[in-house]
């Protein structure tokens, strides 16, 4: 049976193909997570986004906490969001979604050349876990080249990380690999508030010895995964020193808290696609808060 298209329909079909371009075999993804407290946005955003070495990732997702979210108009977002927008627009990016709550934000950008009308049919949900709205998460999901991407950020309390009581709230409602139509590429970034379960003196001793593996043996994320929170999610190998808790504007740990990796990046495919971590590092030049930001770079195969 032959399918005949009108001239108008044929033209629309061709224009649609041209708008999206031929699908590449792979796309690059950068994710950034930073609990910044209430400090002003930094001026050097290129390093924060992983653009300082001439890279042009196809997708950039930024999860932030702080930067003055507790304002009279939190929906307008912190100043850093505007700064991201100004920088990335000049480099050919389009903002797909910017979601701000009282305690966190998630902003996703994509190179404009990859976008078509289907990409803009994105979905965002906000999950609140406690009555004070301090714990919860955001998910933004969208489609590029018929592949579904989902980015999740969450802000957890100390109890959330190891409690089975919050498994439903986080794992079931925020994990888009468990939907009837699972996402192909999923990334979970943010301040997971994961701590190291040893005393500060012992942790500092292991840091001074650069014994990262030894310190990671006490990491709460391992326990959380044993309790099936973040079930099936993978983290790139951690080779950098703990990102919390620093004395602001120094490289010295504040030992009122055990040095820990609070901001994390996890990845997962709901359809068996390949996600390759390329690098995973803390950005030690950003010293103005108790936390160091974490930048992860990935390559996904379409």
UniProtKB/Swiss-Prot annotation:
The beginning of the lineage is: Eukaryota, Metazoa, Ecdysozoa, Arthropoda, Hexapoda
Q: Which organism is it from?
A: Cimex lectularius
Q: What else is known?
A: Has some sequence similarity to inositol phosphatases, but no inositol trisphosphate phosphatase activity is detected.
Where does the chain bind heme? 80
Record carries keyword Acetylation:
no
| Entry superkingdom | Eukaryota
- What does the cofactor field's note say? Binds 1 heme b (iron(II)-protoporphyrin IX) group per subunit.
Q: Which cofactor does it need?
A: heme b
Give the primary localization class.
Answer: secreted
Which GO annotations describe the biological process of this protein? nitric oxide transport; phosphatidylinositol dephosphorylation; vasodilation
Q: Which GO terms describe its molecular function?
A: heme binding; iron ion binding; phosphatidylinositol-4,5-bisphosphate 5-phosphatase activity
| InterPro entries (alphabetical) | Endo/exonu/phosph_ase_sf, IP5, IPPc
Compartment list: Secreted
Q: Where would one find the signal peptide in this protein? A: 1-20
Its recorded name reads Nitrophorin Cim l NP
- Give the GO cellular component terms, alphabetically: extracellular space
